[in-house]
């Protein structure tokens, strides 16, 4: 979902200010001191909150695409696709900076109540986690780029369901955050155990092949690094789920003890 540019938030316009000079023009400089009606403040805050949500949803979508594309690049040893994933990280960083700027402006100009403030700060923290997830996807793509042209490979069947689950986890936890859905957040966190199981399976399978065939040590190491980055994505998702639980309950809880 794209964020929309807005202009003039917080401005109070006198309907006669465009006319001839006189007492009205003399007071134009003081218009910004006139308090806005409460419903205008609330409407503006709603717009700002909506833009922050849109930015987080956009980041989540970009990161999800990155994970799946990085996996495809690894599976097919596609250097061009891997490079595309690596380059696209800049777009995620741009969205993060935009969201952070909106959060800062909203806090400074709208004086949100405690619950809205917690929500805004949580969304800002989540953009950091999503940015790091994007970095992990980029790291998977870098391993894929290094494997381009390699003819001797190891078996890593469990990496595909691992990448698919990691992408799904990102999508689900972002939706849980936007809706402040505690139940969904807990379900997402619980599924991290499956990512861990798949990671250990990949690790055991690849290590076994590396031990029996020295030619597979280098490609096997690349696959193990890729699996590690996917496992780290799962941990980052759990961090976001913990933020959702805090927003819903006010309690700080470790969902990955």
Language model features by range: what are they?
Residues 1-257:
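Cytosolic, long alpha-helical scaffolding segments
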